[in-house]
């Protein structure tokens, strides 16, 4: 029988296999180790180890330099490397997250702008973007024929956010140390946090990356959320001294297995610290971590893509959309609106609150039932006041994991439907 840990490994192997074309060396190494594990465990798994892939970003970036070094004379372009989730937009014309291989939906105007940039130069291999706090910025543009600066200028004309950059001529051998690093970093005077610096020498394609940092451990006092947009909240990790550790998104929080009132490993930069996610940080399974973090954040929030959103009015909007009636701000307005339509009223009467709420959110029925069968509910006055997942192994199914991460919203809609039924028919 396949164990929970085996299923997690196989799921990660499949995800990495799908994203090999956009993998860096660390992801390829992880993929090969999982292929080796899978072959020894199951004899034949249908995929093979790889040495090279058609488009690996490691082809364009040298190994990171984390100690002072001498930089040769020449003309250079320096670029910031931003903190956040890294995405690649290529000739396939879709935004793919580096490492996970997950496709990401972007606004139509952004997609159109990216396509125009790609179509302007047949030599562009890909555009590199960073997503942080629900904001996109182009970080790099890889072209065989021209400097990224030219592509940045064009991208800016099409409305894309572009990085600050610095063009310098270095006339003699120069020590690239912490002082020079800080001077260059300060010249990038935008608000995005920068984790390192990359540079390109004129006439060369490969980027050199400089990252001066120190590892440290910090005590976590609390895990909260910060508002970054219209009902969009990003996880926030607070230390005992009140300092904030930077977190990319919900998945970053999960991978790091961060827990309140424990120490976590961080990368310390000059002005901020970054939550460091690495294998071996505790023995919890992914499902156990997801359950704990959702419990920590509380029942007022649900996972919405990479971030959290607050339950409430969003559920009412989805319910009115499902019923094809006018939007309502309160349950009273919803009841009045339903009373205007005999068809809608009959639908509410004949369909269970359970099924209507599930359909409203578009959950697959079989996966939803599997999740519910692994949960225990506390019901008062026909409403769900609390729930607990008793077996997190079912979260190894990605679809079930997504439903569970969103389950607080289901409960909110279910309770609204229950309230509406009571007012209409009792």
From Swiss-Prot:
InterPro entries: Chordopox_A20R (IPR010267). GO terms for biological process: DNA replication; viral DNA genome replication. It comes from the Viruses. Keywords: DNA replication, Phosphoprotein. Gene3D superfamilies: 6.10.140.1880. Pfam families: Chordopox_A20R. The keyword Acetylation does not apply. Plays an essential role in viral DNA replication by acting as the polymerase processivity factor together with protein OPG116. Serves as a bridge which links the DNA polymerase OPG071 and the uracil DNA glycosylase. Interacts with the DNA polymerase catalytic subunit OPG071. Interacts with UDG/OPG116. Component of the uracil-DNA glycosylase(UDG)-OPG148-polymerase complex; OPG148 and UDG form a heterodimeric processivity factor that associates with OPG071 to form the processive polymerase holoenzyme. Interacts with OPG117. Belongs to the orthopoxvirus OPG148 family. This is DNA polymerase processivity factor component OPG148.
């Amino acid at each position: 029988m396949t164990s929970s840990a085996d299923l997690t490994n196989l799921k990660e192997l499949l995800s990495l296999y799908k994203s090999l074309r956009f993998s860096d060396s660390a992801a390829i190494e992880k993929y090969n180790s999982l292929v080796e594990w899978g072959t020894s465990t199951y004899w034949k798994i249908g995929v093979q180890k790889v040495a090279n892939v058609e488009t690996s970003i490691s082809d364009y970036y040298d190994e990171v330099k984390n100690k002072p070094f001498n930089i040769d004379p020449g003309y250079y372009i320096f670029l910031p490397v931003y903190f956040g989730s890294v995405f690649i937009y290529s000739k396939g014309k879709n935004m793919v997250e580096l490492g996970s291989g997950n496709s990401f939906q972007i606004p139509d105007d952004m997609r159109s702008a990216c396509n125009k940039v790609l179509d302007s130069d047949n030599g562009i291999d890909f555009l590199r973007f960073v997503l942080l706090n629900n904001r996109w910025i182009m970080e790099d543009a890889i072209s065989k024929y021209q400097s990224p600066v030219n592509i940045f200028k064009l991208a800016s004309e099409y409305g894309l956010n572009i990085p600050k950059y610095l063009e310098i001529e270095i006339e003699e051998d120069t020590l690239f140390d912490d002082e020079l690093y800080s001077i260059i970093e300060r010249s990038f005077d935008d608000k995005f946090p920068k984790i390192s610096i990359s540079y390109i020498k004129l006439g060369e394609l490969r980027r050199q990356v400089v990252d001066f940092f120190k590892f440290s451990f910090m005590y976590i006092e609390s895990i909260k959320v910060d508002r970054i947009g219209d009902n969009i909240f990003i996880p926030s990790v607070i230390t005992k001294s009140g300092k904030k550790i930077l977190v990319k998104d919900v998945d970053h929080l999960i991978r790091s297995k961060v827990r309140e009132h424990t120490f976590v490993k961080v990368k310390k930069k000059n002005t901020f610290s970054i939550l460091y996610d690495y294998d071996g940080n505790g023995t919890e399974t992914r499902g156990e971590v997801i359950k704990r973090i959702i419990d920590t954040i509380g029942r007022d929030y649900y996972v919405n893509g990479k971030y959290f959103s607050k339950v409430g009015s969003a559920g009412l909007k989805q319910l009115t959309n499902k019923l094809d009636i006018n939007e309502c701000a309160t349950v009273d307005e919803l009841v009045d609106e339903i009373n205007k339509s005999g068809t809608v009223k009959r639908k509410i009467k004949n369909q269970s609150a359970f099924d209507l709420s599930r359909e409203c959110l578009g959950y697959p029925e079989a996966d939803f039932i599997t999740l519910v069968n692994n949960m225990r509910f506390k019901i008062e006055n026909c409403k769900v006041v609390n729930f607990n997942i008793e077996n997190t192994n079912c979260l190894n199914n990605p679809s079930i994991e997504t439903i569970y991460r969103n389950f607080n919203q289901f409960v909110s809609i279910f309770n609204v439907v229950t309230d509406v039924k009571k007012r209409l028919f009792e």
